[in-house]
Amino acid sequence: KEADSISKLKSDIIVLDRLSTTGNWMSHLKGKFKTLVSMDDIGSGAATADIVINGILHDLPSKKNRYIGYKYLFLENKYFSLKKNNNKKVNNIVVSFGGYDKRNLATFFLKSLLNKNCLLKKNLNIDLLVGEIDHKTINSWKMLIKNILADHKIKINLLIFPLDYFKRLSRADLAIVSGGLTVFDTISRGIPVIGLPQYKHQLKTLINLERKNVIKLGSLGMKLDKENFINLINKMITSLEERVFLSKNSKKLFDKKGSERVLNILSSLF
């Protein structure tokens, strides 16, 4: 039904952004448009698309009209210039697990901070940036935050869909994020990152980025382990050398021209 609805759109070009299309689904669209473009698609339907642009997921073999690799990352360019050099101390941590926190990683993060070994220094600021969520979960987070603040003289801001998201992100000394587009928005700004996966394909992304020395994986595979996570947070907070190492590598990996490249590809179709 969805494919039928899309096929009725009056357009020469259709751009799809779906993780895993099927050949049958894409075949309903093939021929209904002059050009069928699929982005970050690792499904069987990608073979049906006229053009594939995969900036995040690189599992497809290279072929004509396939643009694969980080050089085609389509990222928000706001506040790139605000990122300062790495501070000697971590004063500001930004935490974001995407618009939909499937695994409730925010709860895992907050409960981890209750660990007695967690090094939360005085006057540390934490921005917990969340998407759409129910009131029950929000109230549980507020209770966890209250318990954390009872033991630590820090500040935790719980912000739902903040309008200044990228501004806050750009000012982070350390970020804890999931493995979707959020991790690329973060490391492209040269911010040291601890990554936690929402899904198995995100784990694959995070492992690949860790191998390139631009992030640290905060989980044991898909397993969330508080002790392991807190030890890593402590290491990142106390080691300027580690943060600078990740930051320098991320700046080398991303040239911030991915959005321009993608727009040029799409513009050439007109």
Task: For the regions a language model picked out, list residue spans one by one.
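C-terminal alpha-helical cap of glycosyltransferases
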Residues: 255-270
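Donor-nucleotide binding loops and adjacent catalytic segments primarily
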Residues: 91-171
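Short hydrophobic beta-strand element within catalytic cores of glycosyltransferases
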Residues: 175-177, 192-201
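C-terminal "capping" alpha-helix adjacent to the active site of nucleotide-linked donor transferases
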Residues: 216-217, 224-242
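Acidic donor-binding loop of glycosyltransferase active sites
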Residues: 170-181
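A nucleotide-sugar donor-handling region in carbohydrate enzymes
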Residues: 47-104, 136-137
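Active-site and donor-binding regions of nucleotide-sugar-utilizing enzymes
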Residues: 1-66
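A short, well-ordered alpha-helix in the C-terminal region of glycosyltransferases
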Residues: 235, 242-256
